[in-house]
Amino acid sequence: MSAQSAVGSIETIGFPGILAAADAMVKAGRITIVGYIRAGSARFTLNIRGDVQEVKTAMAAGIDAINRTEGADVKTWVIIPRPHENVVAVLPIDFSPEVEPFREAAEGLNRR
């Protein structure tokens, strides 16, 4: 993991908004989606990881995508540079085995 690793989290109303955000984010920055959470009735949170600047770029693209999605609404968002290891260990923001190939590709580790 890069010393400049960051986590970004965005919460929206409606699944189409989070789907649009996810697609825009992976296209805009070299980030990895580490998961999403259904946070309540029609509320969804998407969590991403990557280099600080890449996360900032991806978050801006995700917010823009949500704002362009009919019926979707950004409720809140945050970017945390270099999250503390205790935060990573407890909250669902770490890389899982399922997303490892995407992390490797985003970080340029997969040279196939």
Curated annotation (Swiss-Prot):
Pfam family, one: BMC
GO molecular function, one term: structural constituent of carboxysome shell
This protein's GO CC annotations: carboxysome
Comment, domains: The tight homohexamer forms a pore with an opening of about 4 Angstroms in diameter which is positively charged.
Encoding gene (name): ccmK4
Compartments reported by the entry: Carboxysome
UniProt cross-references to InterPro entries, sorted A to Z: Bact_microcomp_CS, BMC_dom, BMC_shell, CcmK, CcmK-like_sf, CcmK/CsoS1_BMC
Annotated SUPFAM superfamilies: CcmK-like
Biological role stated in the UniProt entry: A probably minor shell protein component of the carboxysome, a polyhedral inclusion where RuBisCO (ribulose bisphosphate carboxylase, rbcL-rbcS) is sequestered. The central pore probably regulates metabolite flux, as might the gaps between assembled homohexamers. Homohexamers make sheets that probably form the facets of the polyhedral carboxysome. This subunit probably makes both homohexamers and heterohexamers with CcmK3.
Gene Ontology BP terms: carbon fixation; photosynthesis
Family to which this protein belongs: Belongs to the bacterial microcompartments protein family. CcmK subfamily.
Primary localization class, coarse: other
Subunit structure as annotated in this protein's UniProt entry: Homohexamer. Interacts with full-length CcmM. Forms mixed heterohexamers with CcmK3, probably with 1:5 CcmK3:CcmK4 stoichiometry. Only very weak interactions with CcmK1 and CcmK2 were seen.
Keywords (A to Z) from UniProt: Bacterial microcompartment, Carbon dioxide fixation, Carboxysome, Photosynthesis
Lineage of the species this protein comes from: Bacteria, Bacillati, Cyanobacteriota, Cyanophyceae, Synechococcales
Span of domain BMC: 6-92
SMART domains in UniProt: BMC
Stated name of the protein: Carboxysome shell protein CcmK4
Record CDD domains: BMC_CcmK
